[in-house]
Amino acid sequence: MLAVAQDTELDRGATSVASGAERTCALTRELKPAADMIRFVVGPGGEAVPDVKRKLPGRGIWVTATRAAIEDAVKRNVFTRGFKRDVRVALNLAAQTEQMIERAALDALAIAGKGGTVISGFSRVETAVGRDDILAMIHAADAGDDGKRKLAATLHRNTTVKSREIVMIDMFTGAQLDLALNRPNVVHAALLAGPGSETFLARVARLTRFRTGILADAVSAHAPTDGA
């Protein structure tokens, strides 16, 4: 059960948040792990800025890391109260935050791709399904159902991977995957264990939680415990 904090004090800067620390949500006043929150600071123009990577200077406030919580915080004037000063707050602050989290996930995918842990192309992905080191299957959000069904059937038939959860990811468009992996026409891909893979999965988990407020069981195993 979450403890209820007694204040919404500003932090003393991004470096003051230790790994595993808890912070008070400025909206709900609940004490939660920092990994489940988004930090906000005041930018040079007096505007509320999402500090998704927790590196921006200045004192910050924390809000539960879901789209619904940030939208509610904007409506309830939480940022002005939390910072104890007038702060300009964009009406689309939740959308801005989501774009940053999505960008961080795609950046991690790019690093994994450069590290050789992302296989793309239908036939190569189909072959990769039998590997012991496969962690996830990635489908473009605009991929056709036929290819997804065939790969799902291949996965279902494979006894090697049946006993463990393979994360299914379909939140990025083909254009986004092309850009992240610097490859043309990426529709299906497989993520293998290796450099950058767990960081990518942690950021996918963070994006999933931000959008839905919940985590699927397979994704939750990779949820960030720090500022992934």
Where in the sequence are the language-model features?
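Helix-rich interaction surfaces within compact, conserved domain-sized segments
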Residues: 168-222
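Extended interfacial segments that mediate partner engagement and assembly in macromolecular machines
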Residues: 68-147
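Arginine/glycine-rich "motif VI" loop of SF2 helicases in the C-terminal RecA-like domain
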Residues: 130, 155-164, 182
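Basic Arg/Gly/Lys-rich low-complexity intrinsically disordered segments
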Residues: 1-22, 203-228
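Short, solvent-exposed amphipathic alpha-helical segments in soluble enzyme
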Residues: 152-158, 205-207
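N-terminal cysteine/histidine-rich coordination modules
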Residues: 1-85
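Conserved nucleotide-binding/hydrolysis micro-motifs of P-loop NTPases
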Residues: 32, 68-70, 142-145, 175-176, ...
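Catalytic cores of RNA-modifying enzymes
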Residues: 1-4, 11, 21-30, 46, ...
